[in-house]
Amino acid sequence: MARKTPIERYRNIGICAHVDAGKTTTTERVLFYTGLSHKIGEVHDGAATMDWMEQEQERGITITSAATTCFWAGMQQQFDQHRVNIIDTPGHVDFTIEVERSLRVLDGAVVVLCGSSGVQPQTETVWRQANKYEVPRMVFVNKMDRAGANFERVVKQLKDRLGATPVPLQMTIGAEDEFKGVVDLVKMKSIIWNEADQGMTFEYQEIPADLQEKCAKLREQLVEAAAEANDDYMNKYLEEGELTEEEIKAGIRARTLANEIVPVLGGSAFKNKGVQAVLDAVIEYLPSPTEVKAIEGILDDGETVAVRKSDDNEPFSALAFKIATDPFVGTLTFIRVYSGVLESGTGVYNPVKSKKERIGRMVQMHSNNREEIKEVRAGDIAAMIGLKDVTTGDTLCDPNNIITLERMEFPDPVISVAVEPKSKADQEKMGIALGKLAQEDPSFRVKTDEETGQTIISGMGELHLDIIVDRMRREFKVEANIGKPQVAYREAIRNTCEIEGKFVRQSGGRGQYGHVWIKFEPRAEGEGLEFVNEIVGGVVPKEYVPAIQKGIEEQMQNGILAGYPLLALKATVFDGSYHDVDSNEMAFKIAASMATKQLAGKGGAVLLEPIMKVEVVTPEENMGDVVGDLNRRRGLIQGMDESVSGKVVNAEVPLAEMFGYATDLRSATQGRATYTMEFAQYAEAPNNVAEAIISARSK
C-alpha cells in the first residue's frame, strides 16, 4: 500500500494546558471543524468525545491522553490535505506524567491558556517539560469571552513568567461579552466568524478604527520577528520596511521550529471563534516529522548510538508511549512510529524486554471510535491490540535491525496508601485490576508490605490515587477500603566515613568469609548509588565486586534509620580480604550490607521528607487565614502575587502536612480559593518530626 498523505503533510501535535483553560473544548472544536464529529461535545454536560473515560466526564477533567487522527486543508481550503494527529494531554498536576509522556512523542504543541487567568503553575510545568524535549510550540489564548479576559496581559505573562519570546499573529477584537473575532496581523484583515453555523464560515472585514494603531504596531513587531530568520529577509526589511505575506510566514515558521519564538493566537473555543485559525497555524508554523531532530537510539551492542530518520525506507522503529485498557478489545498499546513501515501480521522485537511480539490488529483512534488499519508508516500514531509484554516507554523495532530508543524517565511516587478488598471475592480481582493499572501508568506503583501483608499503592498525589481506586470500582468492579495516606520518606547521610564490613562464619566444614572496607560519601547530584571500585592488587577478587555492590544496594532499599530507602549515596570499595575456600558471593554481599548498616551512626544519617510546591489563589479578604494556615503546616512562603482571580500565594510545604488541605481550604474560604500542588524536592526533616517518625517505625 502506498502512503496516502506525504510525510511532509503530517503534523503530530499535543494540546497542553492548565486545568480549566478549555483544552478539551478546543480539541472538540478541532474534531468538529475537521469533519469528524458532527455534534460538538461539551465538557459542561459531560459529552466531550476526547474525554472517554466515564470519570473524566463526571469530573470534567481529562485524565488519559487519547490520540486522534483528523484531516485539514485550511480555512479557505488553501492547503493540500494535511493529516493532523492530536494527542490530548491532561492538565491536572497529578497527571504531569501523562503530559511528559505525550510530549516525548510529539513534534509540536499548542499550549492553551485561559484569557483571564493566563499563565498558571501547571503551565510552567508543561513549559519546562516542553523545553526539555525541545518541542516547538504556539499559544492559543482561549476563553476571550470570559470576564476579565485580556489578550495583551497574557502575552506579557508569557514573556515574564515563562521567559518565552511571544509573537502575536493576531489581535483580539473586544473581550468578555464584546468579543467579536480577531485581526489577522499577517493579512491585516479582521476575521469575523458566522455564529449561525457554529463558526463553520467566516468573512474578512476591515480592521475596526479603534484598533488600527495598535495593530499597525503589532504588525511591525511581527514583520521584524520574521525578518530575523535570515540575512536576506533582514536586508529586504531594512531597505523596504516590509516583507511579503509568504516571507513573513516562512520567517515565523523557521524561527518557531528553531524554538526561538512562540506564535500567539486568540479566540474562544466555546463560542466557536478562532479554532480554525489555530488549525491553519498548526499547518503553517509547526513541524512535520521530517523537520524535527531525528530520533537516536542504542544498537544491539549496547554502546553504538544510531539515528533513525523519519523515512519509510529506514528499518522500523517505534516507541510505546501509552497503554490503555479498552472495555471491548482488551489492552491497547499506543505507539509513535519514528521510521520504516509495519504491516499487521508481522513480528516486531522489544529490546527492553528482549522479547518478540506478533502484531495482530492495529487501529487508529478517533477519540473513542476506532478504525482498523493494515499498516503503519513513519510519522504515524496508532494503537496495537493485544501486545503481551509491552510497557510504557518500551521500543518496538525490526527484529533484524535492533535499536533501543531512549527510555522515558518517570518520577518516583510521593504518596502511598494501603488498600484492602472489601470481600474475599474482590481479593483476586483487585490483584488483576492493580496489575493492569500499573502497566498503564508508570507513575503508579503497587507492592505488598512484607511485615503486614497489606497491598500498598503509591502515586503522584491524593487525586491520582483517588482516581485509581475509582477506576478499580468502575472498570474492574472491585470494591476496596483505603487506609490513611503515607508519606514516602527517604534517608540520607551527612558525613563521609570509612567503614569495615566483615562476615565470618565457621561451623564445621565449609565456612563463610567476606571482608571489605568501604568509603561512604553523601552524593551531591543525582539519586541512587554511585559505586566506585578502587580495589588494587587482587585483595578482593573481581568476581566478588558485583556482590559487594548488590549488598550495598539492597541495604539502601531497606534503609538504615527507619526503614526508608536511602535517596543517594556514593560508595567506594578500596580494601578487604578473602579466603581461598570460604569466600563466596553471598559472604561479600552480607559483609557490604553490614558495612552499610553502620552508616546510621557513623554516617550522620538523617530523615528526608518530600516538600511540595504549593500555589494558592485566594480572595484578598482570606489572605491572612491562608498564609497563617500554611505557616502552621510548616510551610515557607516563597512569594505573593496579584492575579485577576485574587491574591496568589506561593509556598513550599512538607507533603505530610498537606493531607486534607483541599477540605480545610474550602471551609476557610467558603470554597472561593483554589490550590495546586506538585513535588519540589526532598529536604531534611526537623529533629522533632524525624524522631516521632523513627520511634513510630520502631514499635
UniProtKB/Swiss-Prot annotation:
tr-type G domain ranges (all copies):
8-290
- Which GO molecular function entries does the Swiss-Prot or TrEMBL record give? GTP binding; GTPase activity; guanosine tetraphosphate binding; translation elongation factor activity
Q: Could you name the domain of life of the organism this protein comes from?
A: Bacteria
The answer to whether the entry has keyword Amino-acid biosynthesis is: no
Which UniProt keywords are present, listed alphabetically?
Cytoplasm, Elongation factor, GTP-binding, Nucleotide-binding, Protein biosynthesis
Which of this chain's residues are annotated to bind GTP?
17-24, 88-92, 142-145
User: What does the record list as GO biological process?
Assistant: ribosome disassembly
Query: Does this entry carry the keyword Protein biosynthesis?
Result: yes
Location(s), subcellular: Cytoplasm
Q: Which SUPFAM superfamilies match?
A: EF-G C-terminal domain-like (SSF54980), P-loop containing nucleoside triphosphate hydrolases (SSF52540), Ribosomal protein S5 domain 2-like (SSF54211), Translation proteins (SSF50447)
Quote any Pfam family the record assigns: EFG_IV
Q: What GO terms fall under cellular component here?
A: cytoplasm
Entry's family note: Belongs to the TRAFAC class translation factor GTPase superfamily. Classic translation factor GTPase family. EF-G/EF-2 subfamily.
- Check the record and name the HAMAP family matching this protein: EF_G_EF_2_B
Role this protein plays: Catalyzes the GTP-dependent ribosomal translocation step during translation elongation. During this step, the ribosome changes from the pre-translocational (PRE) to the post-translocational (POST) state as the newly formed A-site-bound peptidyl-tRNA and P-site-bound deacylated tRNA move to the P and E sites, respectively. Catalyzes the coordinated movement of the two tRNA molecules, the mRNA and conformational changes in the ribosome.
The name of this protein is: Elongation factor G 1
Q: Which organism is it from?
A: Hahella chejuensis (strain KCTC 2396)
The gene name reads fusA1
